[in-house]
């Protein structure tokens, strides 16, 4: 991967890099700015109004030192000469009015920016979540769930901090700096130029801080993502962790990642610890120098005491915003690194895109055809060298073969989780790439060996593919797969909560609920990918009758290492190395001397010692 070929850095390719080529860093920052501008665009009018509000707020703030100058120079002398406090009272009232305007406009500004910031975060979360769901399995195969969680939590939180307080501080600081500089020169050019003399050094110091913090906060976002990734994966696989006594090793890994995250934050804190006191030091030295120089000018009669007092107040206002800017850099660099990652995710495109003009499939029949299909995964190794296959509508086909033979890949192509590298996969004569997502997911349903259940009731999980299904339809589907008895025996029946990942149910019960879910969806093509692998032999036999009901009048692809499941199929395809080496009805293949016959004999030998289970 070369640093100058920017095509290699699209999407999430730069996520794990601490330091990037300057050209790539520029492109990532530009991509992040485009995302931020896109999020801010709907609020253009509100932002313009808020800029006007903050201008008024800063004008009121800047007016107070000038009013102090007027009070000292024009309000106090008349009182000492016996003319009364009229001028001073007027100035005091003006100061109070300016303070009231400052408070009111500040309240409006903070209230509106808080609401706009939350609306933007709402849209960003929605957009990122929706995009993650649209991305193809090929992306999720290499992008861990921990990284997904990190994008939607810590990265969003970093952007939230910038929107809620960062922009407020930046806008206020910039307006204060510009306004103060103008007023310093207006009050006295000599003192003004002297006060602004350290500004070039301050800008150089700030530029150095920006460059260093950019690297540091990118590293911070990467390390916190790794901490979240390890935590999520460890908790998701907690049963395996405890079963293999991996707790000490996992703790060691987590401690190392956690230490890396701490070190990255410490480096950021060191930068802030250097920059913020440095700005204060420059500001205080400038105040001392102006006090000395201004006092000398005042003795010479070139400036009044009021002007000198206003100068000192303005200088405090002038250098305080530099500290605000330093804090904004802290927030912005963290948010900028988060924006880089989120914009990278949003730049990813599904490997299985939606067609521009989808072909409607009103009543799918389930005829599947592979025409010269070739397929390989990301490493380029052919999984299906060439596949020509026709499956008539309503036929159940069992795919048999050793691990890595290509069975699951073939099924995933039918479900269009992937697109072939060459050739076409057709459903009822229509290329799957021309079908809309809704039509395809209605026509083809996959039941996997993971039998994933979502938190909720059994009825909710059965309705997953058809949320509008009635209770009667849910019960009918559960009866069809032979699960009604066990569901009814549960304390809360169909309203029983399955727990996280269905953990309150046994593996066999989870599989039966997954079968019921598929049956209720009523697809034209049903794919069972190792769908009975979680059942023991007696349980598997009990489900055979229900399986025949499920497969009736629909096309089915059955992938199983257990050949008892294959016996209910109309046709068997034996695969090896991505090719079909045997094809025929199961009875005929069993009687032959091929691979399927050998597998069948081995299966009979493996269950010869098991007790009989009544049909």
Question: Whereabouts are the PLM-identified features?
Answer:
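Transmembrane helix-loop-helix hairpins at lipid-water interfaces of multipass membrane proteins
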Residues: 47-105, 185-190, 288, 301-305
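Membrane-integrated ABC transporters
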Residues: 1-61, 76-91, 109-113, 117, ...
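Transmembrane helices of ABC transporter permease
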Residues: 46-56, 165-219, 290-303, 320
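ABC-type nucleotide-binding domain
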Residues: 354-355, 361-615
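Helix-loop-helix
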Residues: 78-79, 183-197, 267, 271-340, ...
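An intracellular "coupling" helix at the cytosolic face of ABC transporter transmembrane type-1 domains
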Residues: 44-45, 137-138, 154-163, 167, ...
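Juxtamembrane helix-loop junctions of ABC transporter transmembrane domains
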Residues: 21-29, 52-53, 60-73, 98-145, ...
């Amino acid at each position: 991967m070369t640093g100058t070929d920017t095509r290699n850095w699209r999407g999430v390719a730069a996520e794990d890099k601490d330091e990037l080529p300057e050209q790539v860093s520029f492109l990532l920052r530009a991509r992040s700015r485009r995302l931020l501008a896109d999020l801010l665009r709907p609020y253009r009018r509100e932002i313009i109004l808020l800029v006007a509000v903050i201008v008024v707020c800063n004008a009121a703030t800047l007016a107070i030192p000038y009013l102090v100058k007027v009070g000292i120079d024009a309000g106090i002398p008349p009182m000492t000469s016996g003319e009364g406090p009229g001028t001073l009272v007027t100035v005091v009232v003006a100061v109070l009015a300016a303070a009231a305007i400052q408070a009111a406009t500040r309240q409006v500004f903070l209230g509106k920016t808080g609401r706009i910031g939350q609306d933007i975060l709402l849209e960003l979360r929605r957009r990122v979540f929706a995009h993650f769901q649209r991305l193809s399995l090929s992306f999720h195969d290499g992008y861990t769930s921990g990284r997904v969680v990190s994008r939607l939590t810590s990265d969003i939180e970093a952007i939230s901090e910038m929107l809620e307080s960062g922009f407020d501080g930046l806008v206020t600081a910039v307006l204060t700096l510009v306004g103060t500089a103008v007023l310093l020169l207006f009050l006295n050019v000599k003192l003004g130029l002297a006060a602004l003399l350290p500004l070039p050094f301050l800008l150089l110091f700030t530029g150095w801080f920006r460059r260093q913090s950019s690297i540091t906060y990118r590293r911070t976002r990467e390390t916190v993502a790794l901490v979240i990734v390890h935590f999520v994966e460890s908790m998701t696989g907690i049963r395996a962790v405890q079963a293999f006594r991996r707790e000490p090793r996992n703790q060691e890994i987590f401690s190392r990642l956690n230490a890396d995250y701490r070190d990255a934050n410490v480096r950021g804190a060191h930068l802030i610890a250097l920059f913020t006191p440095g700005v204060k030091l420059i500001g205080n030295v400038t105040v001392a120098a102006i006090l000395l120089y201004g006092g000398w000018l005042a003795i010479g009669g070139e400036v009044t005491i009021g002007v000198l007092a206003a100068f000192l107040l303005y200088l405090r206002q002038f250098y305080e915003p530099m500290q605000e800017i330093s804090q904004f850099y802290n927030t912005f660099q963290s948010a900028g690194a988060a924006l880089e990652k989120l914009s990278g995710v949003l730049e990813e495109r599904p490997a299985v895109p939606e067609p521009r003009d989808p072909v409607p499939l009103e009543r799918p029949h389930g005829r599947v055809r592979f025409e010269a299909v070739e397929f390989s995964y990301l490493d380029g190794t052919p999984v299906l060298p060439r596949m020509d296959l026709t499956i008539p509508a309503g036929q159940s086909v069992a795919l048999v073969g050793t691990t890595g033979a290509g069975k699951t890949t073939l099924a995933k192509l039918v479900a269009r989780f992937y697109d072939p590298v060459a050739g076409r996969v057709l459903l009822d004569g229509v290329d799957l790439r021309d079908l809309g997502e809704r039509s395809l997911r209605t026509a083809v349903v996959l039941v996997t060996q993971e039998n994933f259940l979502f938190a909720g009731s059994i009825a909710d999980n059965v309705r997953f593919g058809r949320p509008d299904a009635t209770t009667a339809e849910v019960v009918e589907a559960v009866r069809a797969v032979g699960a009604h008895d066990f569901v009814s025996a549960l304390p809360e029946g169909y309203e029983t909560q399955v727990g996280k990942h269905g953990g309150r149910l046994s593996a066999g019960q989870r599989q039966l609920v997954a079968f019921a879910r598929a049956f209720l969806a009523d697809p034209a093509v049903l794919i069972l990918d190792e769908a009975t692998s979680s059942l023991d032999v007696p349980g598997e036999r009990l489900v055979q009758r229900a399986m025949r009901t499920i497969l009736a009048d629909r096309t089915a692809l059955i992938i199983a290492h257990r050949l008892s499941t294959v016996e209910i199929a109309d046709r068997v395809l034996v695969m090896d190395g991505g090719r079909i080496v045997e094809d025929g009805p199961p009875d005929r293949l069993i009687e032959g001397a091929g691979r399927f016959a050998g597998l069948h004999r081995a299966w009979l030998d493996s269950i010869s010692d098991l007790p009989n289970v009544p049909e």
